[in-house]
Amino acid sequence: MALELLTPFTKVELEEEKKESNRKQIGILGGNFNPIHNAHLVVADQVRQQLGLDQVLLMPECKPPHVDAKETIDEKHRLCMLELAIEDVEGLAIETCELERQGISYTYDTMIYLTEQHPDVDYYFIIGADMVDYLPKWHRIDELVKLVQFVGVQRPKYKAGTSYPVIWVDLPLMDISSSMIRDFIKKGRQPNYLLPKQVLDYITQEGLYQ
């Protein structure tokens, strides 16, 4: 994996590297997915297409390594909603290793596990431009960048910089958040068109976020 490459990084270069190595190129989009929404799906799909990845894995976290722990629903509901959201969607799948491992979901531990399980795969870890600024604070970041290629998602013309190797992908801003959807539901408003209909139907059926 070419960790020395910085922005700009073209799809053509990535495709050439892929052809030469014959290794699988897999993206990872981690998150709480509480619930999953359309912006998550657009990011995963567009990164897959723009970088020519074989697949993008949506990876629900167990406990995020944040000081302010997030309030979240049971993992079985988050997983069911993920399954519904990507049903019949090409190129997207689910990775559950962090849920199975339990405890705090450190990306370093996850990538050690995945690279040992799948030594023929190059992993691309997708994060927002705002998270790029926090890379120096990530757990064992200097070792982590040797295991995974970071992909930063930014708005067109948005300028972000980092000393760490990051591939940049431009995407239009979609101002959708899980907290917004939860707030809509709590207030009795239907978050139509913000998340897949089958996910909204599941939320209604299970009485979530009331």
From Swiss-Prot:
| Gene Ontology biological process terms from the UniProt entry | NAD biosynthetic process
What keywords are annotated for this sequence in UniProt?
ATP-binding, NAD, Nucleotide-binding, Nucleotidyltransferase, Pyridine nucleotide biosynthesis, Transferase
Q: Listed GO molecular functions?
A: ATP binding; nicotinate-nucleotide adenylyltransferase activity
UniProt keyword annotation of NAD present: yes
Q: In which pathway does it act?
A: Cofactor biosynthesis; NAD(+) biosynthesis; deamido-NAD(+) from nicotinate D-ribonucleotide: step 1/1
Gene3D superfamilies cross-referenced by the UniProt entry: HUPs (3.40.50.620)
Q: Which reaction does it catalyse?
A: nicotinate beta-D-ribonucleotide + ATP + H(+) = deamido-NAD(+) + diphosphate
Which cysteine residues pair off into disulfide bonds?
none
Q: Which Pfam families match?
A: CTP_transf_like (PF01467)
Keyword Nucleotidyltransferase on entry: yes
The Enzyme Commission number assigned here is 2.7.7.18
Biological role:
Catalyzes the reversible adenylation of nicotinate mononucleotide (NaMN) to nicotinic acid adenine dinucleotide (NaAD).
Q: Which HAMAP family does the UniProt record give?
A: NaMN_adenylyltr (MF_00244)
Record-stated family: Belongs to the NadD family.
Q: Which PANTHER family match?
A: NICOTINATE-NUCLEOTIDE ADENYLYLTRANSFERASE-RELATED (PTHR39321), PHOSPHOPANTETHEINE ADENYLYLTRANSFERASE (PTHR39321:SF3)
This protein's name: Probable nicotinate-nucleotide adenylyltransferase
